[in-house]
Every structure is written in structure tokens, then in C-alpha cells.
UniProtKB/Swiss-Prot annotation:
Lineage start: Viruses, Duplodnaviria, Heunggongvirae, Peploviricota, Herviviricetes
UniProt motif Walker B motif: location: 357-362
Organism: Gallid herpesvirus 2 (strain Chicken/Md5/ATCC VR-987)
GO biological process: chromosome organization
Motif extent (Nuclear localization signal): 188-194
Name of the protein in question: Tripartite terminase subunit 3
Gene: TRM3
Length: 737
């Protein structure tokens, strides 16, 4: 105890001496080149004058003294954050982000690549007016006074504990929360086998609700431990969680004293709380955590798992426990962190405790008298209650937390798996199983799709929305009939946001995918030929070309006319893009007439070869066609037979479109539509006309767009997206002409 007090007194005495020296000398003798741990915590003072009075000046850490209007500009705060905390959070978390970037994206390895050489020469030639020695001393003092506060925070024990927590969690995330025997080792072994699907990722990933639980817990613990330095430490958290654009109002939600998470069954709620509690105990000295659940049997495996993790990571000599009630973790300083367990049948063990974090697992199913004990902790300013639960909205007793949605209380924040905006969409659309805000992804812990939803409904009506999702009941009056399938926000985004594929072609994939849905009719009020040309941009799909072609008359040259239209669209796309595409992969639907499909493919091949020889544009040398075998033969022909893939293709396209992953190029080519209207608006009208038709007691689903309009371009685009994602390259081959 005496040694600890002496150390604190010595530290404070040193800080006073440093402050006195800076005040006396104006920090003029400070080391101008010192950098700590790769960060600019000791960034030198730059003597440049600004033509504003002192009352309108502000100190930007690691930058200098600027006009106070700069304090509200995001660019300066972002630069400050990166310069102060780059070595703490960026090393691990940027590594994760680099691994997650698709290979088609260009990787910038040189920091100077962001500036052109001419801009750098101009910047280096700028000479700033400087203050004289007297004014400079005053500005130095103001600057280093601010920087000293950051140094004081960086050297504090609480901040070091926070950085240790971030570092350890990043290592766990890289290793998918397994195979980490010693968290403080610099080498982290990868998992040899991942039980859950990894979706081609080299590291572990978090569901969005798991990241939010982590953010809520970390922000609140930071505000409690760091006290006056909490606001400065939030800059570090914005770097660590990759949320640079979060405002102070948004981050205030993470410091609220009560947060409710309503998440579907089997999504990894308790699975995530175990390493989170273990890491918090082993990183923050003296932290007190409470954990309660609805029954004793649910607490026992959590108790054992947390204890096993701590013993495996740090050794059994630092872990002590009272069977089923308390786990204690000892630090070299002599301080201890504890976690206390209690079921809703006996909450006496948590009464009178002084928790910093109180996790209430399966909160919707705990006893009412236990809720009263838990709510009593709201009166403790240093305690945050985190309710995590699934919801059975069919009963009032198991969905009382759901009634808290929409609360404007400053103490309470409610997070649901499906937001209010998209709840109606999930309720109406029988194949939707997740919120569009969650990018309609399939969670790692349980694959939820339309088949699972329909199976649950067969056992018990409304069981999917009530028990698995929680928070909605299917209205049987609207189960029959038509319903729209594309969200308004996705339609608006498709109309407004159109990236240019001509100005910057490097990030895009080298291959183009074409789907042709031929129609042999001269009636413009009936179906026409739909053509869609798409490419890939990472996980997104970009529409390069769109055609809706109607024959002038039914003649023997109809197939050649359709093939010429497709070739014209392709050559114009190649002409406006300076970089040559790799392979053009074409699928021509042959359901209506297989002979005509072969003739269309032949005409396209002939036209593309002629364009290639004429060198009118950087035409790809490889034009391949999807081939199918004819019945009873081994001969393959260049056409695509659309059979049962249509519903699957539409389901996939709907998920991608509502997730914002289908985009239209700003330089979209159309020789048939653009003469009369904007091709994107033309396509959008057909998209809004598509509806899902549900019939019969089993709610059989079909898609229709013929009512009041055409759907040819939508079908072509849907199938183009489908073949680009699901058809292997070996199914395409060139044809000889």
C-alpha cells in the first residue's frame, strides 16, 4: 500500500515539475521530434500565425491553434484522432478491414499515393507567417497545456486498461474466439477448423447486435473509469469501432444506463457475452459485473465457461470462485475484479452489490419480482444494465421489453433485430427473415431462410414472427394476393446513386455478364426482348447496359435482329470504357425457341468478331456463351433453359437489391430505351410493378410483373445477377462461326 501511494505522489510531482517548466519557458525547449509509440502524442508545436483574436482561437491536438470554426469540421477531428491513437487501435482493426476487402479493390500501400506529386510540391512550397517570440510563447503554452492533458490520459492506468481490452478483443476476433491460450502473446494461432460457416473470411466476424453490445459496454466502462478523460478517450473508441462519423449525440446513447437488445433465437447472444465478460474482468482492474438469467440451469454453463477461459488465458492461480455464485480475478497490483451470478428465482445475491455492468440474459422470461431487484440498479450512476433476450410476442408476460420500443427516455435505449421501418416488410413478405438494415444477411449462428420460416409456420401458425423473430404477427387477411417486394429506400437509392464506371474502371471486375430474354413478337404492348449487361464491384452488381427491344415485324431475320441489338449494346459499352474487359459471358434463354436462341448466339459471335477485327473499340477477345445439353444427347448448345431457378433467382435478387448491392452505372448504355426515357427510371417502373403472389393454404409464392406493364428488363437483370453469382465459369464456352 505504501509503495503504491509513493508511486502516485512521485508521478504527480513529476507532472507538476513538467508543467512549471513548460509555463516558464513557453515549452520552447521541448523535443520537437519526439513521437511516442508511433503516435503524435508529443507532436511539436508549429509556429504559424492566424489572423483572428484569441477569443476565436481553439487548440486542435497534434495540429495546432486554428480558428474555432475548425473545431466543428470533421476533417480536423479525424486527423487529430488518427495522429493521437493510430498505434493503439489501427494496427489490429485495420488488419481486419484489409482482410475483408475483396481482391478486386485496389490496395493503396503508399500513404503518399493520396496526393499528386504536384500537390505535394505546392504544399511544401507554402511559407506560413510566424509569431514573434513573445506571442509564440503564449501559443506554445496553450498548445502544450492541451497536449499534456492527453499525455496524462495516455499514461493513466485506466487508459492502459482500456487499450489492453481493445488489443485482447481484436486478437480474439482474429482467431474467431478460439485457439487463444495466452491473450498477451504476440502470436495468435488461427483456428484449424471453424464450426460455424466462415463465408470465406479469414478471421472471426461479429453480428451487428454483438458489435453494439460491445460498444455499449465499452463506452460506459470508459466513462466510469476515465472520468474527466472519458471525452478524449472516445476518440480512441471511434477509431477502434470504425465509427468516425458518429456525432456526440449518437455516442451518448452508448453511455445510457439501460439498454435492451431483442434478438431472435439461436443468434449467439449468450455465446458472445461469455468472452466479453471474461475479457472485461481480465482487463479492467476492480470492475464488478453481474450476470442473471431466468433459470439456474442457464447460468451454470456460463459460469463454467467464463472460469475456464480465465484459467486457460492467465493461469489458475489468478482465478478464484465460489461454486455457482462468484468468480474473482486477481491482478498483480492486488486489485480484484469479480462477476456475480444469480437466477431470477434467487436474486438475493445481487442485492446490495455495486456493479458496473449488469447483464440480464433472457430478460423477457425472468420472474417479475426479479425485475424489481434489477431495476433498483438504475439509481446507481456507475452501473449499466444490459437486457439481452429473445421475444415471444404471443404472450404479454414474455414480451414486456418489446413495449419499451420508441422510448425517448435519456436513460433507456432499445435495440431490435428488425427495425420498425422494415417490420411490415418482413411480416408481409413471406420469404424475408431479416431486417434490410442488417443487409439481409444470413447470420452465422443459424441460417434463417424462407424454408425454415415456412416449416415453423406449418408446426404452429405465427410461430416464426412470435417466437423466433419476436415482435410481429402475420395478418392472415393479407396473406392471400399480391404484395410489393422492393423497399422504397432501395428504389430511391437505385435511382439516385449511380457510380461512374468510365472515370474509374480499376475497382470493377474484368468480366461482363449478359442475359438475353428473347421475345418473338411485334406487339409493343406485349413482351419484348429484355437484355441486361452487368459487372461486379466487390460484392455489388453494376448495370452496364439495358435493352428492351421490340421487333418491327416477324420475319426470318428476327433472330439476327435481336443478336445485332445485343452486340450493339456490348460494343458501345466497350467503346466508352478505355480499359479492355476480360471475358463477356452471355446466357440466352432458350425456353421459347431453342433454334432461335442458337441463331441469336451465332449472330452475336459474328458481330463481336467483326468489331474485334475492325478495332473500333477495345473489344474482349473472349466472348463465351452458356451451353446446355439437349434431351437425350451429349451435344451442348448455346442457350440457357430457365426451369426452377426463377424463384431462387428472384429471392437472391430481392435480397441483393433491398440490401443496396445492385447499382446502375452513371454511364449506362441503352440503344432502345434511352431514346424515350431514362433507362434507370424505365427499369424502376418495372421493378415497382413486380409483386409476390401468394396462393393456397401453404402460401405458395410466385412473382409477377405483367399486371399493368412489362417485366422483361427486370427478368433479364434478375437472371444476369443470378448467373454471375451462381453459375460456374466452366458452363461458358466460345462458339465457332
Amino acid at each position: 500500500m505504501f509503495g503504491g501511494l509513493l508511486g502516485e505522489e512521485t508521478k504527480r510531482h513529476f507532472e507538476r515539475l513538467m508543467k512549471t517548466k513548460n509555463d516558464r519557458l513557453g515549452a520552447s525547449h521541448r523535443n520537437e521530434r519526439s513521437i511516442r509509440d508511433g503516435d503524435m502524442v508529443d507532436a511539436p508545436f508549429l509556429n504559424f500565425a492566424i489572423p483572428v483574436p484569441r477569443r476565436h482561437q481553439t487548440v486542435m491536438p497534434a495540429i495546432g491553434i486554428l480558428h474555432n470554426c475548425c473545431d466543428s469540421l470533421g476533417i480536423y477531428s479525424a486527423i487529430t484522432t488518427r495522429m493521437l491513437y493510430s498505434s493503439i487501435a489501427c494496427s489490429e482493426f485495420d488488419e481486419l478491414r484489409r482482410d475483408s476487402v475483396p481482391r478486386c479493390y485496389p490496395r493503396i500501400t503508399n500513404a503518399q499515393a493520396f496526393l499528386s506529386p504536384m500537390m505535394m510540391r505546392v504544399a511544401n512550397s507554402i511559407i506560413f507567417q510566424e509569431y514573434d517570440e513573445m506571442e509564440c510563447a503564449a501559443h506554445r503554452n496553450a498548445y502544450y497545456s492541451t497536449m499534456n492533458s492527453f499525455i496524462s490520459m495516455r499514461t493513466s492506468d485506466a487508459f492502459k486498461q482500456l487499450t489492453v481490452f481493445i488489443s485482447r478483443f481484436s486478437k480474439l476476433l482474429i482467431a474467431s474466439f478460439r485457439d487463444v491460450n495466452k491473450l498477451d502473446d504476440h502470436t495468435v494461432k488461427k483456428r484449424a477448423r471453424i464450426d460455424a460457416p466462415s463465408y470465406d473470411k479469414l478471421h472471426g466476424t461479429l453480428e451487428l447486435f454483438q458489435k453494439m453490445i460491445l460498444m455499449h459496454a465499452t463506452y460506459f466502462v470508459t466513462s466510469v473509469l476515465l472520468g474527466d478523460h472519458a471525452e478524449r478517450a472516445e476518440r480512441l473508441l471511434r477509431v477502434a469501432f470504425d465509427t468516425p462519423h458518429f456525432s456526440d449525440i449518437v455516442t451518448r446513447h452508448f453511455r445510457q444506463r439501460a439498454t435492451v437488445f431483442l434478438v431472435p433465437r439461436r443468434h449467439g447472444k449468450t455465446w458472445f457475452l461469455v468472452p466479453l465478460i471474461a475479457l472485461a474482468m481480465s482487463s479492467f482492474e476492480g470492475i464488478r459485473i453481474g450476470y442473471t438469467s431466468h433459470i439456474r440451469k442457464a447460468i451454470e454453463p456460463v459460469f463454467e465457461d467464463i472460469g475456464d477461459r480465465l484459467r486457460r488465458w492467465f493461469g489458475a492461480h489468478r482465478v478464484d470462485h465460489v461454486k455457482g455464485e462468484t468468480i474473482t480475478f486477481s491482478f498483480p497490483s492486488g486489485l480484484k475484479s469479480t462477476v456475480t451470478f444469480a437466477s431470477s428465482h434467487n436474486t438475493n445475491s445481487i442485492r446490495g452489490q455495486d456493479f458496473n455492468l449488469l447483464f440480464v440474459d433472457e430478460a423477457n422470461f425472468i420472474r417479475p419480482d426479479a425485475v424489481q431487484t434489477i431495476i433498483g440498479f438504475l439509481n446507481q450512476a456507475t452501473c449499466k444494465i444490459i437486457f439481452v433476450s429473445s421475444t415471444n410476442s404471443g404472450k404479454a408476460s414474455t414480451s414486456f421489453l418489446y413495449g419499451l420500443k420508441g422510448s425517448a427516455d435519456d436513460l433507456l435505449n432499445v435495440v431490435t433485430y428488425i427495425c420498425d421501418e422494415h417490420m411490415k416488410h418482413v411480416t408481409d413478405y413471406t420469404n424475408a427473415t431479416s431486417c434490410s438494415c442488417y443487409v439481409l444477411n444470413k447470420p452465422v449462428f443459424i441460417t434463417m431462410d424462407g424454408a425454415m420460416r415456412r416449416t415453423a409456420e406449418m408446426f404452429l401458425p405465427d410461430s416464426f414472427m412470435q417466437e423466433i423473430i419476436g415482435g410481429g404477427v402475420v395478418d392472415r387477411t393479407i396473406c392471400q394476393g399480391d404484395r410489393s417486394i422492393f423497399t422504397a429506400s432501395a428504389i430511391d437509392r437505385f435511382l439516385i446513386y449511380r457510380p461512374s464506371t468510365v472515370n474509374n474502371q480499376d475497382p470493377f471486375s474484368q468480366d461482363l455478364y449478359v442475359y438475353v430474354d428473347p421475345a418473338f413478337t411485334a406487339n409493343t404492348k406485349a413482351s419484348g426482348t429484355g437484355v441486361a449487361v452487368i459487372g461486379k464491384y466487390g460484392t455489388d452488381y453494376i448495370v452496364f447496359g439495358l435493352e428492351h427491344y421490340f421487333l418491327r415485324a416477324l420475319t426470318g431475320e428476327s433472330s439476327d435482329s435481336i443478336g445485332y441489338c445485343v452486340a450493339q449494346c456490348l460494343i458501345q459499352i466497350c467503346a466508352i470504357h478505355r480499359k479492355r474487359f476480360g471475358v463477356i459471358k452471355i446466357a440466352i434463354e432458350g425456353n421459347s425457341n431453342q433454334d432461335s436462341a442458337v441463331a441469336i448466339a451465332t449472330r452475336i459471335a459474328i458481330e463481336m468478331i467483326s468489331y474485334m477485327k475492325a478495332a473500333v473499340a477495345p473489344t474482349p477477345h473472349n466472348v463465351s456463351f452458356y451451353h446446355s445439353k439437349s434431351n437425350g444427347t451429349d451435344v451442348e448448345y448455346p442457350y440457357f433453359l430457365l426451369q426452377r431457378q426463377k424463384t431462387t433467382a428472384f429471392d437472391f435478387f430481392i435480397a441483393q437489391f433491398n440490401s443496396g448491392r445492385v447499382l446502375a452505372s452513371q454511364d449506362l448504355v441503352s440503344t432502345t430505351v434511352s431514346l424515350t426515357t431514362d433507362p434507370v427510371e424505365y427499369l424502376t417502373k418495372q421493378l415497382t410493378n413486380i409483386s409476390e403472389v401468394v396462393t393456397g393454404p401453404t402460401c405458395t409464392r410466385t412473382f409477377s410483373g405483367k399486371k399493368g406493364g412489362n417485366d422483361d428488363t427486370v427478368v433479364a437483370l434478375t437472371m444476369a445477377v443470378y448467373i454471375s453469382a451462381h453459375i460456374p465459369d466452366m458452363a461458358f464456352a466460345p462458339i465457332r462461326v
